[in-house]
């Protein structure tokens, strides 16, 4: 209890401080009101000029803190003149919390959009760009258009970044003082910027300050979904079809086991026997059958754990993922690890080729790159620990401008879903007769359509808002508060759009919100409730539950069922109990805790790839931005030569074997015959380096003489292609490592530590391979002067072909690996089986 009171005291103390600063802003109202429009714009110019003279971000932030009251007062006055709306004190307080890099939790209808204008204006003065982020492109478009009036009045520029825009249009949007965009588009633009070949092809500026609307949706709900840019991998789809046919034949408990709580599914011994007969293999779990078992497991997941119209939808022959938190489809997103292909096989649509990841990043890692990050939402307090631990953001609950009058009624619990839905329909019919508008919230598209059919049978006119008709979202939400309106909505419930009450609705009790099921996250339930009772309006909310709801099944509805049977309750009689409501909330807390742990675990694993990504992207960018890349090439030539000497030459031996070293030098650096055993015999490692280096330098100079001024362009092209090719393969290898690493825990090993160590080794090997390839292609490529190497356009993602190199004679050429005699996981096994080491003696 002490911990809770500390948090509450902390919030109260914070609110007092925000209130004092807000009063300073309000105190400047009269002084600002006498300024002309031109004088207001001149103030903006003055601030910008003073900030431009400060080159340090921290000092700029100190200056912004100093001018905050005056800047916020200017925005208030501008808002009054442009929109005829003056931000309230609580909105100023929310704006101050955002400027501090925190999350302002503000109830629905409290004017978050207007609140954000103050910190956006203030931080845009620094000239480093402010990103205002919304959950969809519709909201970005609407808000940028509306708010541009205010920002332009104040003397700032506004850009809108959409998926459909060209590279030039995107660059222009990012160059403005303020840029509106979705989180997805920002992430993809960042990845694309790190795949270009020339600096002028980039569209973004360095990441400075971001304000995220519906911050919980983006930083919590979508945190586990990585953004991926991929190219097609060549792979047959026939195994998906076979696995799908097999999965259809299986029976639960006999052939496979399914755990409802963890949503995991696996074959029984009997199921494995059937698989061996069906796929004509002797031992299903033999390493050579890893593809077969992988496809079977994926097909089982597609059939058993994922439901059509709940987890995904099929639209025009295409499988679209449904976002579990918003109810919207996510075009362009695909399940990974072959799961999407397994669903396509299940639904009988065309199976797309598997894709190969070329670049990826999670929102957790993308947003942590900003100098300052802030957000706003109606529901964030339940996830405060996660915001603090992962993003270093505090959640500040901003008071409402008017007291909340909504009546949140106790949950009603029924034995069956039929009893629950019958009661829901009766409640809707009763309220509809009185003219009170009703918003029905559902967890899945399937449920919204089922209730819609029940209401049609009763002759109740209504609108359905789900992933199938999201185009009319704004129109449906706008009418949801009118007299007699009945609206069914999935979780999306029109986030970002207010439901305003029509004439005479206040007298009828305001908007009635009915939840047909509890979501696994309390925030989503709070969001649904929050649709009603905006800005002090009247309203009420109630959730109808059944013991057959997924959340209840997952967390022990058997005890409740027995209790209701003992009480002799039938299907039409609900129980209304604080104990049950507490049990439901406890189940939700457990799920939230599990989800937080999962996101934290993902971040720990992703941290390994984040550091590696940072090194690769920095390397790429320095190659692109440097006018001369010869220093990079020189360093690579030297380190590759030194590594090969360390690996092959053992001067302690009485009779060292020089031929493998010479073969390697011929393969990577020189033409055959350029170096002989006589050149290096009897010399120590240092002298050998000098002898060979002189020959390499001469070969390098020869290429420079042939290509002259085109040499730099040629080197850049080779460097970037080599980095991109190996980095893409490395991402794939790291993904494979991660998929199987959890099994290490059964051998009393620490999977995370193993992943970190092996990931580091794989990265070292990749860097060596990049250097080796670069050396080989720069020294051994045969380029004619008349080839006229042109600047290479950034090609379609996924394609990167090397300049053809002279191969010389066919022979076995060993590669130097720094780790002594250790063999890499993806190298051929030394036993000569032809398998990769990880699938043979490396198991």
Curated annotation (Swiss-Prot):
Membrane topology type: Peripheral membrane protein
The keyword Methyltransferase is annotated on this UniProt entry: no
GO molecular function, a single term: metal ion binding
Subcellular location: Cell membrane; Cytoplasm
InterPro entries noted in UniProt: Helicase_ATP-bd, Helicase_C-like, P-loop_NTPase, SEC_C_motif, SecA, SecA_CS, SecA_DEAD, SecA_motor_DEAD
Source organism, top-level taxon: Bacteria
Any one cellular-component term (Gene Ontology): plasma membrane
Cofactor(s) demanded: Zn(2+)
Protein family membership: Belongs to the SecA family.
Quaternary data: Monomer and homodimer. Part of the essential Sec protein translocation apparatus which comprises SecA, SecYEG and auxiliary proteins SecDF. Other proteins may also be involved.
Protein's UniProt name: Protein translocase subunit SecA 1
């Amino acid at each position: 209890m002490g911990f809770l009171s500390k948090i509450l005291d902390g919030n109260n103390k914070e609110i007092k401080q925000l209130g004092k600063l807000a009063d300073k802003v309000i105190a400047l109202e009269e002084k600002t009101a006498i300024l002309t429009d031109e004088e207001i714009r001149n103030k903006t110019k003055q601030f910008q000029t003073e900030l431009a003279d400060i080159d340090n971000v921290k000092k700029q932030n100190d200056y912004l803190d100093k001018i905050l009251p005056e800047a916020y007062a200017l925005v208030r006055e501008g808002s009054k003149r442009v929109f005829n709306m003056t931000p309230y004190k609580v909105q100023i307080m929310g704006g101050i919390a955002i400027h501090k890099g925190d999350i302002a939790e503000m109830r629905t209808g409290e004017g978050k959009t207007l609140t954000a204008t103050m910190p956006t204006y203030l931080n845009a003065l620094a000239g480093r760009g402010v990103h205002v982020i919304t959950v969809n492109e519709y909201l970005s478009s609407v808000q940028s258009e509306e708010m541009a009036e205010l920002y332009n009045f104040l003397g700032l520029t506004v850009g809108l970044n959409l998926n459909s825009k060209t590279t030039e249009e995107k660059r222009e949007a990012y160059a403005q003082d303020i840029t509106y965009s979705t989180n997805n588009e920002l992430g993809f633009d960042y990845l694309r910027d790190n795949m270009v070949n020339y600096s002028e092809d980039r569209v973004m500026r360095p990441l400075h300050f971001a304000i995220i609307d519906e911050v919980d949706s983006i930083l919590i709900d979508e945190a586990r979904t990585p953004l991926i840019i991929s190219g097609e991998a060549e792979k047959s789809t026939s195994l998906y079809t076979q696995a799908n046919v097999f999965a259809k034949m299986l029976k639960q408990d006999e052939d496979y086991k399914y755990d409802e709580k963890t949503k995991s599914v696996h074959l029984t011994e009997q199921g494995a026997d059937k698989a061996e007969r069906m796929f004509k293999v002797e031992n299903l779990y033999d390493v050579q059958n890893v593809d077969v078992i992988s496809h079977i497991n994926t097909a089982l997941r597609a059939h058993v754990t994922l439901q059509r119209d709940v987890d995904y939808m099929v639209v025009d022959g295409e499988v679209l993922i449904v976002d579990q938190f918003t109810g919207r489809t996510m075009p362009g997103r695909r399940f990974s690890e072959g799961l999407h292909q397994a669903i396509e096989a299940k639904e009988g649509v065309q199976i797309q080729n598997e894709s190969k990841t070329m670049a990826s990043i999670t929102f957790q890692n993308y947003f942590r790159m900003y100098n300052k990050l802030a957000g706003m939402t109606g529901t964030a307090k339940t996830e405060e620990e996660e915001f603090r631990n992962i993003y270093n953001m505090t959640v500040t609950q901003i008071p409402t401008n008017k007291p909340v009058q909504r009546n949140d009624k106790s949950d009603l619990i029924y034995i069956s879903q039929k009893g629950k839905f019958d009661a829901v329909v009766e409640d809707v019919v009763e309220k509809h007769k009185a003219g009170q508008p009703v918003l029905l919230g559902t967890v899945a598209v399937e449920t919204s359509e089922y209730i819609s059919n029940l209401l049609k049978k009763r002759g109740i006119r209504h609108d359905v808002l789900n992933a199938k008709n999201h185009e009319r979202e704004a129109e449906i939400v706008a009418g949801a508060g009118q007299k007699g309106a009945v609206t069914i909505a999935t979780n999306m419930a029109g986030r970002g759009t207010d439901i305003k009450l029509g004439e005479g609705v206040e007298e009828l009790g305001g908007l009635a919100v009915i939840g047909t099921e509890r979501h696994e996250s309390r925030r989503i339930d709070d969001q649904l409730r929050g649709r009603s009772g905006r800005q002090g309006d009247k309203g009420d909310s109630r959730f109808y539950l059944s013991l057959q709801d997924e959340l209840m099944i997952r967390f022990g509805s058997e005890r409740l069922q027995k209790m209701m049977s003992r009480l002799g309750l039938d299907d039409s009689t609900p129980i209304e109990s604080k104990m049950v409501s507490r049990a439901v909330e406890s189940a939700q807390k457990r799920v939230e805790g599990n989800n937080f742990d999962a996101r934290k675990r993902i971040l720990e694993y992703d941290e390994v790839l984040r550091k590696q990504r940072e090194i690769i992207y920095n390397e790429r960018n320095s190659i692109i931005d440097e006018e001369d890349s010869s220093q990079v090439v020189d360093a690579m030539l030297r380190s590759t030569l030194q590594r090969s000497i360390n690996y092959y030459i053992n001067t302690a031996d009485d009779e060292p074997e020089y031929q493998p070293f010479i073969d390697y030098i011929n393969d990577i650096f020189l033409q055959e015959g350029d170096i002989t055993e006589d050149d290096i015999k009897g010399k120590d490692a240092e002298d050998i380096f000098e002898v060979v280096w002189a020959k390499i330098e001469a070969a390098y100079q020869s290429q420079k003489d042939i290509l002259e001024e085109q040499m730099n362009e040629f080197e850049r092209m080779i460097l970037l292609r080599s980095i991109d090719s190996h980095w893409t393969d490395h991402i794939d290898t790291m993904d494979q490592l991660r998929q199987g690493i959890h099994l290490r825990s059964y051998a009393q090993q620490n999977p995370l530590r193993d992943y970190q160590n092996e990931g580091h080794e794989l990265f070292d090997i990749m860097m060596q391979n990049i250097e080796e390839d670069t050396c080989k292609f720069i020294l051994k490529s045969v380029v004619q002067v008349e080839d006229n190497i042109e600047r290479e356009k950034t090609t379609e993602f996924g394609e990167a072909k090397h300049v053809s190199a002279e191969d010389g004679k066919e022979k076995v050429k060993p590669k130097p690996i720094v780790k002594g005699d250790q063999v890499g996981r993806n190298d051929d096994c030394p036993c000569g089986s032809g398998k990769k080491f990880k699938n043979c003696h490396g198991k």
